């Protein structure tokens, strides 16, 4: 499925993947809530520059397309519809899932890291994350 004309500029300066395939639209139109909202496109940024490119694109389009928006998504486990929208979804889990800088008191994660993966690394050092995210699946 082709990108809608008004979203064609998304491909510019974007190294990641963009999909508008019907099966993907169906999958990303739901989360753990009772709601269903079909997005126009789903993006999979490869790095922070891709995320910046998406934000810049949407910001530049706001005048002509006031309804355009970005919704970041992890596991889609939100129970309030917070990970679905009718515009552009940014799936952080495919490429932005690195755990780094694991020291005695700190850890740095990218937004797509699953909690279970972080927990394994922390427990190997006899550490825990004292507060769980709302969804234990994602950090």
Where are these regions (language model features)?
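Short, acidic (Asp/Glu-rich) active-site segment that either coordinates a divalent metal cofactor
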Residues: 78-80, 89-92
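N-terminal accessory segments
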Residues: 1-32, 57-70, 75
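Short acidic, glycine/serine/threonine-rich loops at helix termini
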Residues: 80-86, 119-121
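N-terminal glycine-rich flavin-associated loop
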Residues: 10, 34-66, 92-134
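Short capping/connector residues at structural and topological boundaries
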Residues: 23, 30-33, 40, 82-84, ...
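Core alpha/beta catalytic barrel or barrel-like domain that forms the active/cofactor pocket
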Residues: 23, 73-74, 106, 131-139
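Flexible loop/turn segments at secondary-structure boundaries
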Residues: 27, 78-80, 115-117, 138-139
């Amino acid at each position: 499925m082709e990108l809608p004309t008004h979203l064609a500029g998304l491909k510019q300066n974007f190294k990641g993947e963009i999909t508008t395939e019907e099966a993907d639209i169906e999958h990303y139109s739901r989360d753990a809530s009772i709601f269903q909202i079909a997005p126009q496109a789903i993006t999979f940024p490869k790095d922070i520059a891709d995320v910046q490119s998406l934000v810049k694109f949407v910001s530049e389009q706001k005048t002509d397309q006031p309804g355009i928006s970005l919704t970041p998504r992890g596991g889609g486990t939100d129970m309030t519809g917070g990970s679905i929208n009718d515009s552009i979804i940014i799936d952080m889990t495919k490429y932005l899932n690195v755990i780094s800088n694991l020291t005695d008191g700190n850890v740095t994660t990218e937004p797509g890291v699953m909690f279970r993966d972080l927990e394994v690394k922390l427990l190997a050092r006899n550490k825990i994350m004292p507060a769980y995210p709302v969804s234990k699946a994602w950090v």
